[in-house]
């Protein structure tokens, strides 16, 4: 009885989360990939730029909505929803860094079809660094927005992490725990505490899109979250970072926790990296200060 009740609660939450339909879907825009279909949009003309969102719960290509039209004036802008996120398939696999490295490389080869510039937000910076190290010929210039700490990326799953992953993936009850983690209040708190410099700037439509994306796909939304929580997506990128000779530019939010220490580590690994700090921003400078962010993009690309 309890299981049926919890299943009903889960279903109700997932359905309610998608009522606002913030994430528009056009059926032509799917890249059929071996682990699942990848949703993307393509806008504008000019040299290609690929936008890759962060991996926070509820993240999707919607993260770039405040800058993609402006970028499309001078570039062909490709915005993807990573596998396990947004409108892409929520596959029941263990998500690793290498899954995303392959996804990004295959997307560039099959859909973009030429060397591309890339802007990667948050944790996705690690995927792009590794993908570029593996297949340098696919990448032109790379912009990393608040990339993850090199120390954090070195942490590998231990026994406790593996148990956590298994517990989260128990059908129905794992989903209930996940729904608590990505509740509307928690998504709002994520924006207020972690994403924005000024909590009064929080964009409700952006929060709605995260809430909706976090619940799209029912039970299967848990697999990316469990892989992240249990550190399966971590990988040591120091060797790859040192070896890159592409132009790399880091945009850091002024109040991103440990932002300066993180960028100092990146620059120590690869002294050719340039850094720009955007004032009065935190984890999502391209959302909170789109004009200032676009200025940096124009300088770099």
Per-region residue spans from a language model:
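Conserved loop-alpha-helix segment in the C-terminal half of the alpha/beta-hydrolase fold
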Residues: 243-281
């Amino acid at each position: 009885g309890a299981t049926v009740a919890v299943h009903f609660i889960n279903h109700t939450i997932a359905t309610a989360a998608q009522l606002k339909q913030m994430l528009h879907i056009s059926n032509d825009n799917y890249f059929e990939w071996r682990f699942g279909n990848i949703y993307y949009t393509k806008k504008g003309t000019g040299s290609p730029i690929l936008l890759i969102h962060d991996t926070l719960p509820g993240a999707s290509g919607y993260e770039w909505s405040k800058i993609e039209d402006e970028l499309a004036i001078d570039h062909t802008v490709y915005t993807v929803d990573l596998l396990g996120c947004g409108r892409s398939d929520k596959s029941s696999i263990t998500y690793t860094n290498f899954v995303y490295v392959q996804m990004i490389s295959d997307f560039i080869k099959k859909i973009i079809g030429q060397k591309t510039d890339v802007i990667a937000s948050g944790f996705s910076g690690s995927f792009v660094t590794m993908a570029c190290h593996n297949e340098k010929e696919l990448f032109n210039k790379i912009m990393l927005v608040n990339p993850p700490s090199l120390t954090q990326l070195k942490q590998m799953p231990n026994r406790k992490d593996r148990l956590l992953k298994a517990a989260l993936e128990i059908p129905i009850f794992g989903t209930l725990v996940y729904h608590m983690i990505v509740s509307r209040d928690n998504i709002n708190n994520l924006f207020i505490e972690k994403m924005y410099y000024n909590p009064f700037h929080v964009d409700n439509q952006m929060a709605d899109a995260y809430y909706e994306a976090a619940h799209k796909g029912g039970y299967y939304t848990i697999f990316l979250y469990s892989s992240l929580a249990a550190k399966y997506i971590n990988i040591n990128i120091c060797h790859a970072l040192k070896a890159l000779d592409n132009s790399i530019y880091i945009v850091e939010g002024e109040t991103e926790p440990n932002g300066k220490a993180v960028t100092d580590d990146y620059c120590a690994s690869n002294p050719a990296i340039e850094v720009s700090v955007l004032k009065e921003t935190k984890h999502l400078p391209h959302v909170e200060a789109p004009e200032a962010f676009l200025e940096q993009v124009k300088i770099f690309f």
